[in-house]
């Protein structure tokens, strides 16, 4: 299955095929459901390029998130320099950057989004929490959206459709809100509080309530409200599907549906989110993927598979 996608994408060089395959393994561990969606739902020529962009985003995110701040800052500075040099010269010996450059040669808009992402990625490095909802919105614009556009630009090839960036922002707003609630246990363990202080105050919840996993009416109401915001925003993101080519729509629908299923699982879990994250049941995931796989097959039977 994977080798046919490399062939369809015109990736024949043995070193480059090995690089793409290594990044595939990284993405499969990082986001297994989304990885399956890439393989099952996207046109074969596009799948390796989505893997390359996702792997770059994840590698950068790991450098920003893990370890003491001085080490993270030094690692990101070195990484940014290496990536910018590769963008300037068109060559690299790094197994994450080589596939990115190859994908950028096929999808030139990606390289502009890589530069935009690098311009503001240190926002995550400098993260100290949000005082207000406005602070969260700035984080969304400076980090979450540029990161998502690394992959979203591949789903709408050619000139960017009118309204596409705004539609992507709506989706990533809902997705980020969900992640911040669903990852509370992990983030709190890393002394990282992602809920705005004014939101905590309005619900009468303290950071200690969350760190100590207190199951109180106030905490339950807070979690319900946060997940309601995520659910509402994800529901508003569905129009983005109409802005990508028909061959890519099953993947986009599945992406939103997987997030909505995770939101439902998190809602059912309630205050237990303070000790571990929620995941949709396997039958739910399979139902989403199989439904959109049928849709993808119908599209491919009615259109020539030329995306990529």
Question: PLM ranges: what are they?
Answer:
Residues 1-175, 181-308:
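Catalytic cores of Mg2+-dependent Asp-rich isoprenoid enzymes
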